[in-house]
């Protein structure tokens, strides 16, 4: 449990999360995949949480726009969702149970890329999980936008290898933040580890 860890150590842990959804409309669309990873403040992976495809009927998947239909078929998520027996409540409870082993409630910002969208979906479909996070976000896409404004050449070193599944997107986000830390850290006077 987190209580056994030194407070300083556990308070600096970061929870990375990614969702795949049927679309971007938070009122109409639904979460179909969730994954989490816990890192320390230096972005070293400490633990990989459960990765769930969330059960939805075929008619929900067929109602997705063309981009989502193609992407989720190509990644294999389409079939995983159809084969899954996991519901939102189960995925939420299991994810919280995993996080409780690593990070205290409210101690970590929500970390990832374009994380505000994930937070909106969690608020509606997994509210207990959304409340597990601190109200702040660590959004890697903010650094991407700043790099594009201030030093576009930094973006040349960003390599995405993801297959647009939740877990692979998390690892891409962590790698991207490592790249910005290395590239922008010296510019900002930060030590580069």
From Swiss-Prot:
Keyword Cell cycle: no
GO MF term set: 3'-5'-RNA exonuclease activity; nucleic acid binding
First-tier enzyme category under EC: hydrolase
Gene3D superfamilies listed in its UniProt record: Ribonuclease H-like superfamily/Ribonuclease H (3.30.420.10)
Pfam families attached to this UniProt entry: RNase_T
Subcellular location: Cytoplasm
Keywords of this entry: Cytoplasm, Exonuclease, Hydrolase, Nuclease
Active-site residues from the entry: 135
Domain Exonuclease stretches: 14-177
Any one of the GO BP annotations: DNA metabolic process
EC number: 3.1.15.-
Domain of life of the organism encoding this protein: Bacteria
Predominant subcellular localization, coarse grouping: cytoplasm
PANTHER family: OLIGORIBONUCLEASE, MITOCHONDRIAL (PTHR11046:SF0)
Role: 3'-to-5' exoribonuclease specific for small oligoribonucleotides.
Entry's family note: Belongs to the oligoribonuclease family.
Protein name: Oligoribonuclease
Organism: Xylella fastidiosa (strain Temecula1 / ATCC 700964)
Higher taxonomy: Bacteria, Pseudomonadati, Pseudomonadota, Gammaproteobacteria, Lysobacterales
Gene behind the chain: orn
């Amino acid at each position: 449990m987190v209580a056994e860890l030194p407070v300083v150590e556990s308070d600096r842990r970061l929870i990375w999360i990614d969702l795949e959804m049927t679309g971007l409309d938070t009122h109409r669309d639904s979460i179909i995949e969730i994954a989490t990873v816990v890192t320390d403040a230096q972005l070293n992976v400490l633990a990989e949480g459960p990765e769930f495809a969330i059960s939805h009927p075929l008619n929900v998947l067929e109602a997705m726009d063309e981009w989502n239909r193609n992407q989720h078929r190509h990644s294999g998520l389409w079939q995983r969702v159809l084969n899954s027996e996991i519901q939102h409540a189960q995925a939420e409870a299991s994810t919280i149970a995993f996080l409780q082993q690593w990070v205290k409630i409210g101690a970590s910002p929500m970390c990832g890329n374009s994380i505000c969208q994930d937070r909106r979906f969690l608020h509606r479909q997994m509210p207990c999980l959304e409340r597990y996070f601190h109200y702040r976000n660590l959004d890697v896409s903010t650094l991407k936008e700043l790099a594009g404004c201030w030093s576009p050449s930094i973006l040349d070193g960003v390599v995405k290898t993801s297959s647009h599944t939740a877990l692979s997107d998390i690892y891409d986000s962590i790698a991207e933040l490592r790249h910005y830390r290395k590239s922008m850290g010296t510019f900002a006077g930060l030590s580069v580890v």
